[in-house]
Amino acid sequence: MTIIDQLNTALSGIVLHLPYLLTILGWTWALHVVNVFFGYRLCMFGIIPRFPTGLVGIFIAPFLHGNFNHIFMNSFFFLGLGSFVILQGEQVFNVVSIAIIVIAGLLTWLFARRAAHVGASSVIMGYWSFLMVRAYYHPDIIDLLAAALGLYYFGVHMAASLVSHEKGVSVEGHVFGFLAGAVTGAFYPAIAMWVLAGADKLGLYLGG
């Protein structure tokens, strides 16, 4: 298969899976509208480090955002990097997303400063590092292109976010998300077995 053929296949795959990503994004925006209606009080359900109830926020925090700029920027990056991750298949996308959410969320709960941590930035950072690790282990043209484009278009913003001191920005979430994505990429087979086994026990279907 030529490079052009691979690129055409990738583009077709992105278009095919775009409705799935837009559905996730749609529910995230719907939740944000509800959050705005309640004066952003839903953010209290984010990850609150070292509070037992804050553990629930691990699965809720990625869908909560502190303002419209926050959710708008994350929506853009989610579609960009998520499109490359989902090229591996919806099951891989779901496994990677869950692994990043759980690993980054637990690390944030254990080690982050005491505050309500919300936003999809940790997941997006995880997608970026996952793609880079995958490109290292499986250097085909699509994975290399995904990592390169992620680095070029998103790298400056995300690298800056790692050391950001902006109020309301969860620096720890960015760092732990990046680490979670790298770990998921490096140990994907083992992590996939763990995630799929857990999903099976809960009766969840993550795609074939």
Predicted segments, located by residue:
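A detector for small-residue-rich transmembrane helices and their helix-helix packing motifs
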Residues: 2-208
